[in-house]
A protein has these predicted regions:
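Hydrophobic core of alpha-helical transmembrane segments in multi-pass integral membrane proteins
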Residues: 18-27, 63-73, 104-116, 247-270
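Juxtamembrane helix-loop-helix connectors linking adjacent transmembrane helices
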Residues: 31, 38-55, 80-155, 163, ...
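Membrane-interface segments at the starts/ends of alpha-helical transmembrane spans
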Residues: 8, 41-59, 235-249
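Functionally important transmembrane alpha-helices
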Residues: 23, 27-31, 191-248
Length: 278
């Protein structure tokens, strides 16, 4: 079997396992909900108020955590993804000694800017935020949304899909493919559109460093801010009352600042457009 076939089979396998993970979590939660240790408020699925769902929030939150952790272990066991946090490559980004803080800040600014620019479109989130808000009321849910879930996504889309395909379809092609899949699994335009562009930013950094510290840290910071917004109304509704020109203008400025911060080290176009070495 040729190398290209093996790599694309691994890519398809990782992505399918990720999708299977999403189906497995509620099944595990349903099984745990009958145990006294996981008694609690019933997990409310918006739109299903007239149906009976015997899944409790503690069970759903714990299932998210355990199943995602098992997924990380499975990737490590199969060797399909290299779980490497230290590559030894430069991650300076123009701020000697502070690359992680720099990129985390850049990523959060970029993320907030995209959200502001999309506010005038009034996109539907498919009740995803309502579901995640319930999970964020439990410590296992917070750990899943902020820590383990972000690691799963970085391993799947950056260390997995991007790294496996870049040798065959080039850096740009791999960035687009991994970001598109990353966007699609979010399941709604409210999250998918910013996820695509943020996926490009994360893939770009992984291309430069092959070091998950920066990608994972930035992803953690972004999700932590989202969880905070669930419980702090001024942050959750930031910019909603602004006129459209201000939403788009401030958002575009933040996106420009984030983009400049991402590229400030200098031109990487030569490497970016070059095909990765085999």
């Amino acid at each position: 079997m040729t190398l290209i076939t093996k790599d694309f089979l691994k890519t398809a396998g990782i992505f399918c396992l990720f999708l299977l993970l999403q189906l497995l979590i509620p099944l595990v939660a349903w099984g745990l909900s009958s145990l006294p240790a996981f008694a609690g408020t019933v997990y409310n699925i918006p739109g299903g108020e007239n149906a009976t769902f015997d899944i409790t929030i503690p069970a759903m939150a714990f299932s998210f955590f355990v199943v995602q952790l098992a997924f990380v272990r499975l990737l490590h066991f199969t060797g399909w993804v290299s779980i490497k946090l230290f590559s030894g490559k430069s991650a300076n980004f123009g701020f000697s000694g502070m690359p992680m803080f720099h990129f985390v800040g850049v990523f959060v600014v970029l993320s907030m800017g995209l959200q502001l620019m999309l506010l005038p479109l009034h996109l539907d989130d498919g009740n995803t935020n309502a579901l995640f808000k319930q999970l964020s009321s439990n410590i296992w849910g917070v750990l899943s949304l902020v820590v383990v879930g972000t690691l799963v996504e970085e391993l799947t889309y950056r260390a997995g899909v991007f790294q496996l395909t870049r040798k065959h379809i080039g850096n740009i092609g791999a960035m687009l493919l991994s970001s598109l899949l990353f966007a699609l699994v979010h399941g709604n335009l409210y999250q998918a559109i910013p996820a695509f562009f943020l996926g490009l930013a994360l893939a770009y950094v992984y291309l430069r460093t092959e070091d998950l510290r920066l990608c994972w840290s930035a992803h953690i910071a972004n999700n932590a801010l989202a969880v905070l917004a669930f419980h702090y109304a001024p942050l959750a509704h930031l910019g909603e009352q602004w006129p459209v020109w201000q939403q788009v203008g401030v958002g575009a400025l933040m996106v420009a600042m984030g983009g400049f911060g991402l590229l400030m080290k200098g031109s990487l176009l030569k490497r970016l457009f070059g095909r990765a070495k085999r």
